[in-house]
Amino acid sequence: MNGILWHVKFVSPHSDWLVDRTGTLTVATTDPATSTVYLSDSLEGEFLLHVLIHELGHCILASYSLLDDIHRMVYPEYWIEMEEWICNFIANYGWQIFTDAYEILGYDALDILPYELERLIS
């Protein structure tokens, strides 16, 4: 993403890699310092896909320096909450956006959407 190679690693559900910035054990974390997404190896099916899309949202925010925008527009005490809200929005509604675009544009959506999204965030 934006020239950064991200890695995805599956780890034990009790791994220290799954402890987030607030000290909470979660099912996945993203470490921008190492460009790594850590996923619990107990995840599967639709929940795995949902969590992965959420974590890819964190990758996008870090890769395109969008966290700086959050930090500029939101009080510091809300930075983490806003970042999580954005990634939840992507995970919860991103698929719907692509599905609707595909229904409207057909196969052209597969060519047009990635280009337009890249243009919007670069």
Language-model-detected regions and their locations in the chain:
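Active-site recognition of the HExxH zinc-binding catalytic motif
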Residues: 50-62
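Metalloprotease/metallohydrolase-associated module, dominated by Zn2+-dependent proteases
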Residues: 1-47, 63-122
